[in-house]
Amino acid sequence: VLLFDIDTLRADHMGCYGYGRNTTPVMDEIAKEGVRFDDYYCPNAPCLPSRASMISGQYGIHNGIVGHGGTAADMRLQGTTRSFTDDMSENGLFMQFRRAGMHTVSFSSFAERHSAWWFNSGFNECYNVGRRGSESAEMVTPHVLDWLERNGKKDNWMMHVHYWDPHTPYRTPADYPSQFADTPLPDDWIDEKTFEEHLLHIGPHCANEINMWNDDTFPQWPKHPGKLTTLEEAKHLLDLYDDGVK
């Protein structure tokens, strides 16, 4: 089993999901030979809550992780029923592959980036290039290929490969757009107006950083409206973190 975990990649911008430009030819070929989900929903969209749901099989409101800071970023404690190991490490997604007799390996810096060490539970091997999510695919893939060269012909392995390239910081190679110079833009192309609207909603991952608790200080981030005096101002502040706790 080869599982690609590509951070913040939109399905509707991939060829295998019908996007009009040839932006993901390699992944499209892999999709032809693998499993492609038509109806797969993310209950908690930010990076940390999303993977907590994927690993635990629970909504964030149940596993405890609904945000990126404070207690909202901590897995809920099991309590008095915990034995030598907790239920998360024994029953998480990757442990299911291991229980099935597969050798599990991960190439990811996610656990270090978010201090989410539970993410590594169930893996026989974990490889981290040490860039805390700032690495590009060129830094990860050589290690993946090396492992496959040494172990790929063996039976019963499960590999998790994590790429961060679509995530910030955006660093598309300068010559990349030239590949599509002769390809018409799709009808749903993200134009400058859409991008400007997106910038209005950019904020950090912690309520304290966006100055939510001090109405009298000039907001550091454009998303923060200062005082909330109308319903529309309140709607402007709502984001995916709120969705995770409703």
Label each region the model flagged.
Residues 1-246:
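Catalytic domains that recognize anionic headgroups
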